[in-house]
């Protein structure tokens, strides 16, 4: 067919020229579409208080200074693998808020509050997606529950961290988040890099599931640049978002085919980051591949990193730990009551082990200060 004989675009035809198509080609695999509450509606229900905003502002500034060499404390993102029970999360937050104050001279403690879970295949996708854990997928309820929980935790003076998985959810909760993560499965995703470029909080990018650090380096460079992408406004309208870029992004070493928390791995990663023209500021994920998927190994990882810090290692700026009220994990089985304070996703260390790890890290920071001072003469 020649160019001149191509049919006119549908939008240029008259109604007489454009009868309804015989074949339906739209939404063929869509079962149902429900209205989503606008972000502004949920925010008005649970508005940020002055104390909550101060908690977030103070923590973001502290993390910014850590990332740029202005604060020698250690960032510790610690908490449950995922939130499935808001009551247990509030209990955990109450304990962690006390620990935050106890160790605040050495540690910037941020509670891990993950509402969305990326799945390798299928499974429970988190509190926002299915807040009742029963397959009812009451997402509007999940968004309300998530924001209410974040607000309560911020009111304790405890900052929070979460993983961002889509372009819409941040409009509901991001003002209450002090630090964000982009996971190993999504670090290479263009839309997640674009999202990170516009987030108001510092963001950590995990290395790839195979241990590849390069994709996280590329992600940091991309997120530092301005972007234009599609999302929604606070009123819930489709929108084009233009960003300034995020200078507060860094790498999280989470392991891959092997672990990468030891001194040699840290040095190799730091050199690769520096060779790319970026500041060598690394966070260590004590769980996932670094723990070889055994929650108790997180203690070993944290101890190894603490020893590196005590020897004067300054390129490690933070750790991530999966911790809950009680150790281990449990399966989500319909009709079977859940044990209080036990994860239903990845296994976690318990609270007593958590306090021991925090004490170890606090002492390590103190020793690092001495080592750095001695090195300076």
Regions found by a protein language model. Name each.
Residues 2, 7-34:
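Polybasic, low-complexity association/targeting segments
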Residues 5, 20-27, 93, 106-261, ...:
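Active-site-facing alpha/beta catalytic cores
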Residues 27-68:
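N- or domain-start disorder-to-order transition segments that initiate the globular core
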Residues 38-47, 243-255, 338:
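Gly-rich Lys/Arg/Thr-decorated short loops/hinges at beta-loop-alpha junctions or inter-strand turns
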Residues 75-88, 346:
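Conserved phosphate/anionic-ligand binding catalytic regions in large, soluble enzymes, centered on
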Residues 79, 284, 350:
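Conserved, mostly hydrophobic/aromatic
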Residues 324-369:
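Internal helix-turn-beta structural module
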């Amino acid at each position: 067919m020649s160019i001149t004989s191509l049919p006119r675009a549908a939008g240029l035809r008259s109604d007489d020229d454009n009868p309804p198509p015989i074949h339906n080609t739209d939404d063929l695999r869509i079962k149902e579409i429900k209205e989503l509450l606008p972000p502004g509606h949920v925010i008005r229900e649970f508005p940020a208080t002055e104390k909550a905003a101060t908690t977030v502002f103070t923590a973001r500034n502290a993390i910014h200074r850590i990332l740029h060499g202005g604060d020698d404390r250690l960032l510790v993102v610690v908490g449950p693998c995922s939130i499935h029970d808001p009551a247990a999360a509030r209990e955990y937050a109450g304990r962690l808020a006390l620990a935050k104050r106890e160790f605040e001279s050495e540690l910037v403690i941020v509670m891990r509050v993950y509402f969305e879970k990326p799945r390798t295949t299928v499974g429970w996708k988190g509190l926002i997606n299915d807040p009742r854990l029963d397959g009812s997928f009451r997402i509007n309820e999940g968004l309300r529950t998530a924001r209410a929980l974040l607000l309560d935790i911020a009111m304790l003076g405890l900052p929070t961290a979460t993983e961002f998985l889509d372009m819409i959810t941040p409009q509901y909760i991001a003002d209450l988040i002090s630090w964000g993560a982009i996971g190993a499965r999504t670090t290479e995703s263009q839309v997640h890099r674009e999202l990170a470029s516009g987030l108001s909080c510092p963001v950590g990018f995990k290395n790839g599931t195979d241990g590849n650090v390069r994709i996280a380096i590329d992600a940091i460079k991309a997120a530092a640049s301005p972007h234009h992408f599609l999302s929604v406004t606070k009123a819930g309208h489709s929108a084009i978002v233009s960003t300034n870029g995020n200078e507060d992004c860094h790498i999280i070493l989470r392991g891959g085919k092997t672990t990468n928390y030891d001194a040699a791995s840290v040095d190799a990663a730091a050199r690769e980051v520096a060779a790319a023209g970026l500041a060598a500021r690394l966070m260590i994920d004590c769980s996932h591949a670094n723990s070889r998927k055994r929650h108790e190994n997180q203690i070993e990882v944290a101890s190894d990193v603490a020893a590196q810090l005590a020897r004067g290692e300054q390129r490690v700026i933070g750790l991530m730990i999966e911790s809950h009220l009680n150790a281990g994990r449990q399966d989500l089985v319909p009709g079977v009551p859940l044990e209080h304070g036990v994860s239903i996703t990845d296994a976690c260390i318990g609270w007593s082990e958590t306090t021991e790890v925090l004490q170890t890290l606090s002492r390590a920071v103190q020793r690092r200060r001495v080592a750095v001072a001695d090195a300076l003469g």
